[in-house]
Structures are given as structure tokens and as C-alpha cells.
Amino acid sequence: MRAANLFCIGCPKSATTTLFKILCQHSQIHTPKFKEPFFFNNSNYQNGLDWYANTYYDDVKNEKWVLDFTPSYLYSDDALFRINEYSKGKDLKFIVMLRNPVERAYSHYLHTLRDGLEDLNFNDAIKAESERLLNYKNNLLSQLKYSYMYQSLYHKHLSKYFEFFGRNNFFVINYDSQLLDKSEFKLMIHDLQNFLEIKIESLNIEIEENFASVSRFKILQTLVNSNGLHKRLAKLLFKSKLNRQILINKLRKLNEKKMVKKDIDAEFKKNLYDKYFHADVLKLESLLEKKLHWND
């Protein structure tokens, strides 16, 4: 049975869901039952590749590309090594979406805040990050929730994937220059179809997903994101983990309302960029052989 051969491995809060919805329109691309299988970087991997294929891809037909859009793979050495093992005898391609690292970190922080899992302001959360990641070293989900700055160190993570799979197998997208401008967005979608060597189809790009939001009802958000009796009942009612994931996502969507996002203070943003990201971005620009213009 076939499974994924086209991976979007990052980055969270860089419009990966929007791109996923767009690519799902293409006749030569298979849509999985769940956008983020979260297979190669957590305990689901122990279920085996047959489980992965049967759970998410049992309805694959003759599409050229089969999607796995799990943007947390980029930060996982487990995922890197496991995908490398999985790749034997397969033609895999990768999509990576990058965004101004400070803006991505702040959007990530707002997402965790919305989920009711953050009680610090952004500055204090940054200061607490190293200690938090150490405390949660055996808890992948908590690490992903609180690694605001770490997940914006793109060169640190992407360079490893390039070493394993080769630069020519990656299509890298700059959110700030290729998604925010509609004409550049259309051109990027055209170039991506060429990269995948599929026919050029007219795809609707007027899609906005995972916009900055707040919870309508905080108690519902807390229930969705916490463990307890309700989670155990859900396991009894819904034997399939996939169905539980779909239900939780639907509840989250129903409980969201758009928020007015406050911009980061320009001086604070520049200080964060210079302190945490300047050196990494210079190495990233050298790796990609292009200027990213995030600090112009």
C-alpha cells in the first residue's frame, strides 16, 4: 500500500494549512484524511508503516503525490532519521515554508496563548524557553508548544535535511515575499507544480486558514487541550485515533473567533532578531543562495 512521498516538514505558523488546502485541489495530489499524521516524530511510529498507510492513506488511487503536512518534522532528529529510512527506494520531495523568524515566534506564542497553555507575556516566555524545554525534554507536545525561538532557527534544522536528502529535492517558500503578495503567490504555486512535475492547473488561492484567533469559550478550549475523564470517554466512544483527532480539530475550529493581532514593537522586534536570529539567517541565506530580506 502506498503512503506519503511529498512532505511539508515546516514551519508552523507559516501558512502551511493554507498551502495544504490549495494543493488538495490538484488532480495529481492525494489528500490524506488528516493534514498532520504526526507519525515520524512520535510514538505512533511504533505502530509500523503498514499502520501509517492504512490509517491515513487507504484510499490512495493513482495520484502522483501523496501528502504528509506535519510541520513539526523539521525540528525532530527522530523524524529525520526515520524518514531517511522510509525513503529507501522511494522518490521523496519536500516543501519548507519559512517566515520572518521573530514574526513566526510571536505567532506561535499567540497560538499557545489561545490554547490556554501560556500564562507568561511574550518577553518572559522567551526568557523561560530554555528551562521549559529542559523540563519537557521527554514530552514532545509540550516541547513543540513552548519552543518559540528554537523553531525559528531555520538553518540549524534545515541544513540537516539538506545533508540527508539533497538540496534539489526541496522547494523552499518565503512566506513574507511569496504569500503576502498575490501575484508572487500565484507565481509560486505555478513554480511548485513545475517542481513536482505535474500538469499546471488553476488552483484557488483565496484561502485563509489558521488566522490569529482567540477562544469563544475558554472552558471549552481548556477541555480540548487537557487530559482527564473526558479524554478517556472519547477513547471509549471513538476507537480510531484518527477520528478523535478530527473531532478535536472540529471543536477547536468551532470555538475560534478572529482576533485583532497587535504588532510587535519595532525596536523590540529588531533586538530579538539581532540577538537570536541574525547569525542563523546569514547561514540560511548562504545555504539557500538567496537573500531573505527579513531585517531590511
Per-range role (PLM):
Residues 1-296:
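Anion-recognition interface
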